[in-house]
Amino acid sequence: MDSCDFRGLTSRRRTSNLKNYFVGATPLQKRLELVRRQNSDFPSPSRRKIPQCSQLQEDIDPQKVAFLLHKQWTIYSLTPLYKFSYSNLKDYSRLLSAFIVAEKQKGVAVEVGEDFNIKVIFSTLLGVKGTQRDHEAFLVQILSKSQSSREHREDKVLWTGWFCCVFGESLQETVSEDFTCLPLFLANGAESNTSLIRDWFQKTFDCCFSPLAISAFNLSWMAAMWTACKMDRYMATTEFLWSVPCSPQSLDISYAIHPEDAKALWESVHKTPGEVTQEEVDLFMNCLYSHFHRHFKIHLAATRLVRVSTSVASAHTDGKIKVSLNRSN
């Protein structure tokens, strides 16, 4: 890939008046502001530190983490859970199982604890957090019980979702101890089951789910940061998808790059050890635009980035992500 150099790009910043806003605000105003901020895409500072390997990773269950890989997740933002308790996960499993069966069998009485054809399992995801202060992530699964009496078969997983918080200190500072901050919810499975799960959580913990779209701006950040990750091996090309609005239907442009070429390009623009800056992201993307224009005479900057895919993960602007490989140490 041809090298290119863009100087003098201004860094885009999004300043926050969160601290000033909360001075004198009522508890209700604080919660409303928290909801608004969670629903406005991912925060986009002008620079981000590259997380180092944490001692928390020693607690991670490799089997559970492997289960989360290679699945497409639809992401939602989530307001804090009121009166949620990790010690009650077994009770939540029984209550949610009964709720799902009752919703699927409208008009039929259902007793909690009854033997259903489905079951729900709540379990913690130890180590899936950024700091000790972050609340523990947890996994929710809907399973279909095997109906075969002749042979023992594993229950079939119908739906999976997990709740997590990574480096969420700023969120926890705005709520009381009665609330558990797990601002990110990821779901894999039928939308009907996702809807049931959301309904139950909203009724039980007085929370609110919102679909979380990923802007083209944040997709650029993801592309740069994932390209920067050190990998044991590269299994997939780095791909970008741009959407060109036109009539009568839109046109998509796909751009595939060898992962080692993408890595070399990133290393040529990355000058700040331990962090990624907005200027570096802009340089990285503008080099791609320049290279593409040189060969195809198309200005990608005039289109809209809708998907990025790397050896680490992929993400789409409609709020769908997939994690492919673990980062090497």
UniProtKB/Swiss-Prot annotation:
It holds the Pfam family CENP-L. GO terms for cellular component: inner kinetochore; nucleus. Component of the CENPA-CAD (nucleosome distal) complex, a complex recruited to centromeres which is involved in assembly of kinetochore proteins, mitotic progression and chromosome segregation. May be involved in incorporation of newly synthesized CENPA into centromeres via its interaction with the CENPA-NAC complex. One of its GO terms (biological process) is chromosome segregation. This is Centromere protein L. Component of the CENPA-CAD complex, composed of CENPI, CENPK, CENPL, CENPO, CENPP, CENPQ, CENPR and CENPS. The CENPA-CAD complex interacts with the CENPA-NAC complex, at least composed of CENPA, CENPC, CENPH, CENPM, CENPN, CENPT and CENPU. InterPro entries: CENP-L (IPR025204). Signal peptide: none annotated. Belongs to the CENP-L/IML3 family. The keyword Nucleus applies. It comes from the Eukaryota. It is found in: Nucleus; Chromosome, Centromere. The keyword Phosphoprotein applies. Keywords: Centromere, Chromosome, Nucleus, Phosphoprotein. The modification Phosphoserine is found at S40, S54.
